[in-house]
Amino acid sequence: MKLSKTNYLVYRECAHNAWVKVHKPEVYRAEPLSVFEQAIIGVGNDVDVRARQVFPGGILIRRGDAVGTAQLVAERAHILYQPVFETDRYTTACDILVWNGAAYDLYEVKASTGGEERNAKDDLYAHDLAFQALVLRGNGVPLGRLHLVRLNAGYVSDGTRDLGRLFTREDFTSRVTPLLDAVAMEMDAAHDLIQLRALPPPPCACIYKGRSSQCTTFAHINPGVPDYSVHDLTRIGASPKKLKALVDGGILAVTEVPDDFELSDPQRNQVEAARHRRLHVARAPLEAFLAAIRYPVAFLDYETFPCALPRFAGYGPFHHVPFQFSMHVVTEPGGAPIHREFLYTGADCPDMPFIDALKRAIPAEGSIVVWNAPFEKGINAKLAERRPQERAFLDTVNGRVVDLMDVFSGQMVVHPEFRGRTSIKWVLPALVPRLSYKGLAIQEGATASDTWNRIVTGALEPDAARQAAQDLLAYCGLDSLAMLEIWRALLGMVAAREIREAG
C-alpha cells in the first residue's frame, strides 16, 4: 500500500487518524462531507484552475496517470498540470511543473492568503513540498526550485481580474531543503504504519490537544475518553502542561477535576457548573451589561460569502460579500418584536442594496445587538472602505453595537450545557430549548454562504432557487430571533434574582 501526500500530512497531525483514514474510511467519513467542506474543495479547484492561467499552455494529466506523466517528463514537456509520480512506497500529484531549460520548477497552489495563521501554514506547506520533492527525486526527475503560489492578501480588484497581481509566487526552496532528511524518515514511518493490519493501541497524540485541535476520529480511537472531557475546558489547548497533567493523572471527565488543581477562573466556573449541574450567574456584571442596552433594541445578524476569487470592484481574496441581514427590533420593555429582513439574489454587487436596506430597517437610535461584534463591525468597516460616501452611517452603526456574546465569553453566565463554548448554536438550546436550528434546511453559516452562491451563479433551477431563498430567510431570521430570546432569558435571570439548577 502506497503512502499518498494527503495521508502523510494527516499522519503528521495524528498517526492513528492516518491509519483509520486508510483502513476504516467508513469511520473517517462517518458523516458525509458537509456543505462547508465541499465548498472548500470547490474553492481549491477553482483557484488551481485559475492559477494555471499564470502558466499557460500546459498539458493537463489525467487523474492517476503516472505512466503518461513519466513519458511527458522524459520528453521535457514545458508545462504540466497535475502530473502524477509514484515509487514503490509513495505517490503524489503536483499542481504545476515548469521546465526551466535545465530542471523542472515545482509550483504548489494554495487557496489561501496566509493571514494570521501564516507561520503555521507555511510549515505545513513546506512539508507538503518536501514530500513532493522526495517523490520526484525518487523518479529521477531533475528538480529545480520549489515555489508556493497563493492568493495575494493585498490585491484589490478594480473590476477586472489581474492574474499577475491576484497570485503571489514565493520561493520555498530554502525552507524545504533543510527538512528533507527528517521528512524522508517521517515518510518511512508513516508508510510502515499504514501497512499495519490493526489500529495501534490508544491514546493518539491528540489526547494532549484541546478539543478543537483533535483529529476527526478521536472518539473512535480513544473510546475511554468521555464525550465531555477536560479537553473541552475553555482555552485548555493554550495550556498544554495543564492538560498533560490532567490526562497523565487519569483525570478525563470535567467533573473529576480536583478542587485543588490549578485552573483559571473561567475554567473553574465551567467545572463547577458541570459538577453541580447548576447555572452560574455573575449577577453584578450581567446587570450592568443589560442596563447599558438602550431601546429601541435591534438584534442584527449578517450573512456573507467569502469569495476566494474577487467578483466585484473593491474586493480582495476571501473578502466577505454581505448579501443578507435579519433584524428583530423591540421598541420598549415588554414590546412585541418587529422583524425586518433583506436578501439580495442578483448577480451584481450587493453592497449598495445592502446598505440602503440597512438604512431603512435600522432604528435611528438605540442599541444594535449582535453576536461576535468583530464580524459585523468588520463587514461595516469594509463596506465603508468600498463606499466612502456611506462611511458616516456605517461608523454610526458600529458605534452603537453591543456584543451579546460578551455575556458568555466573559462568563457572566455559565451553563453546564455550554461545555465551554460561546457559539449561539450552543447557548440557544441551553437557555431557550424551545428554539432550535435542527428543523431548518440550513443550520449553519457555511451552508448559508454556499446556498447563496449557488443561487446567484445559476447553479440551481428556478424553483430550487426560490426555495433556497426561503431557506436563507428562515435561517438568518432564527439567528436574530435567537439573540432576542437569549436576551429575554438573561433579563429573566436578573429579575428572578436566584441561581437555578440546570435542566
Language-model regions: role of each:
Residues G114-E116, Y155-V156, G224, V254, ...:
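Flexible loop/turn segments at secondary-structure boundaries
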Residues G237-P240:
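Small-residue hinge/turn detector
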Residues V109-A120:
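Short beta-strand-loop-alpha-helix junction that forms the active-site gateway
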Residues A51, F85, L106, P285-A364, ...:
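Conserved RNase H-like, two-metal-ion catalytic cores of nucleic-acid enzymes
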